[in-house]
Amino acid sequence: DANAKGWDALAWNFRSCSGEMNKTLRFYHSGATDDLERVIEHAHQLGYQSIHLVGFSMGGNLSLLYAGRKGRDIPVHVKSVCVFSVPCDLAASSKRLAERKNKIFMWRFLKDLRVKIEVKALDFPQQVSAEDYHKIKNFQQFDDRYTAPIHGFDDAADYWEKSSCKPVLKDIRIPALLVNAENDPFLAPECFPYEEAKASEWLTLEVPKSGGHVGFIDINCDNSYWMERRVVDFVTAIIKG
């Protein structure tokens, strides 16, 4: 859809999420807006003067966090942000995922993360250990042991507080669309910022009844997904002014 309109798309992955592990001790986390900023700078250096951010899940949180942290100082070439299935409150979302009904999701996340930790332990044996990894049962335990110390946070609670986009939504100064499905199993009530959206002239919150977590399928006759079409419609409206 974007290419059909003459737009270029730049897709990027978090560190260690492309199928290849990065070489430094640091890898990815929800508050790493400096990585997003580098990608934006790269695109701008290539000559792009109108950049629209699109993200989902952790990437959605990162995009809103970037826009909120920048506030009025956001680069003029960053025009809008459109995000889906965003855990705006990381503490609340982590607790939701730790619930018994989400056990299968939690197991899958920790299984995937174990592979990354084992590689880090081989590359940085003095800083990272995979010993007793099987005892980790939720994100609080994982973030306390790995994410926080590796990336300079005091603990999981400190990481969640400083990396959640919800507290800075009020500071966003570019058009922003947040779409969180009512039936998203990963999102606690705190992840639906109704009051923040109501008080902001920049942030729009849409809460469809269905869609789950990044599951906005509804395939059209042209084989496009609803989520893709929503992005195109939103960005088109911004461009037209």
Question: PLM ranges: what are they?
Answer:
Residues 47-150:
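Alpha/beta-hydrolase-fold enzymes
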Residues 209-241:
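Catalytic active-site module of serine/aspartate enzymes centered on a nucleophile-bearing elbow/loop
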Residues 1-11, 197:
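Short amphipathic alpha-helix adjacent to the substrate-entry channel of hydrolases
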Residues 145-168:
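Active-site nucleophile elbow and catalytic-triad environment of alpha/beta-hydrolase enzymes
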